[in-house]
Amino acid sequence: MKQVKIGIIGLGGRAETLLASIVALSGEVVVTAGCDYSQAKIDHFLSLFDKYKLKKPKTYLRHLDLLDDKNVDAVIVPTSWNSHIQIACDAMKKGKYAAIEVGGAASCDELWQMVHAAESTGVSCMMLENCCYGRNELMVLNMVRQGLFGELIYCECGYEHDLSEMGYRTDSRQERSLHNLHRNGELYPTHGLGPISKILKINRGNRFLTLTSTATKSRGFDLAARSRGIENVHFNEADIVVTNIKCANGEVITMTHGVSLPRPYSRDCRVQGTKGIWLENSKGVYIEGISPRYDKLDVAGNPYSTHEWTPESDFYERFDHPIWQAYRNHEVGGHGGMDSLALRAFFDAVKTRSTPPIDVYDVAAWMSITCLSEQSIAMGGLPVPVPDFTNGKWVCREPEKPSRWSLNEVY
């Protein structure tokens, strides 16, 4: 397969960003089809091909019609959250790889349907979780695999981002606003959980066992709505949701979701092992025997030690992941190059007809956190079991084929 022929289902703003990243890959892939139920969005999408001086794709109003197009090898699905899984299932049943955008699941039932579709067809799907290909996330993965962190004990991650403007966008039926209006849980889990899961070898020798979630009161979105004169709305989504996940190998992951209060953006990543720690919010790493440690005396002459962070960037020269060694001087696409790396990984899987580096079991496990956290919160924070979507295969998975795009090992 010389060129991957891609169909894009869902032609909103995210599709426009992804198209820009695809165009920047120059020749590796061609968009041969597009689909949206809105003719206006189709028309705008086609106008972008005039801008890029590219041949216009065939367009459809129904995704099932696009999936019958023999000139499409695989599909990218940047649609509304609740339609990702159904479209992915439909694509796999037609023999086409599917790359879905990020989001959480509405139920575990739909996740099992997705897993069964992949297993029965031999065609997989992938989540385009770009943060798995972030430079620091991959560097820490590389350092962990080389043993610098020792045995992993505890991790943190999350999504904290001031998106309070969603409080006054419900009238426009903005989908993300509606989820926050009606639901209460860990609604956007994968930006932090994806990289942390790969570092912890989830679904390959480890798995999520149980979770508990706790939610605060909800004020931020309501205040944002009132600032625009909207008085008759109350958002269910808590200002802060905290979720603790217990893993089979004994690690604990703490997740924090907060998108309605004033704050800078963070994915809150922390990786703590017996020999070191990475803390995203400090922009630092501490590795025993490498990072600064000073023995001092207090005013009474008693000895004590202080420890200092080493800047993340100080480790790039020795521990930059091979992917970033190859691409750091040639960043293309959105989110600092992460978008294009995730896309390249997907296109490589399509070309080689191999399992993507983020496979259907990963997608199911990560997305399940949303609906399971809702259940835990509704029951006052009671523990909820996380399904084993691998049906036991996590204990001794068949080794993956070595690939530069792997997120499990470093090749």
Please tell me what each predicted stretch does.
Residues 56-62:
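Conserved SAM-binding strand-loop segment of SAM-dependent methyltransferases
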Residues 1-52:
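N-terminal Rossmann-like dinucleotide-binding module
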Residues 74, 80-81, 85-133, 147:
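Beta-strand-loop-alpha-helix segment that lines the small-molecule cofactor/substrate pocket
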Residues 255-265:
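Glycine-rich phosphate/pyrophosphate-binding beta-alpha loops
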Residues 123, 150-154, 376-392, 402-411:
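C-terminal capping/lid region of NAD(P)-dependent oxidoreductase domains
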Residues 28-32, 349-366:
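Glycine- and charged-residue-rich phosphate/anionic-cofactor binding loop of Rossmann-like
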Residues 224-238, 246-247, 275-358, 395-411:
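C-terminal glycine/acidic-rich active-site capping loop/insertion
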Residues 10, 121-124, 131-235:
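Predominantly a Rossmann-like dinucleotide-binding segment in NAD(P)-dependent oxidoreductases
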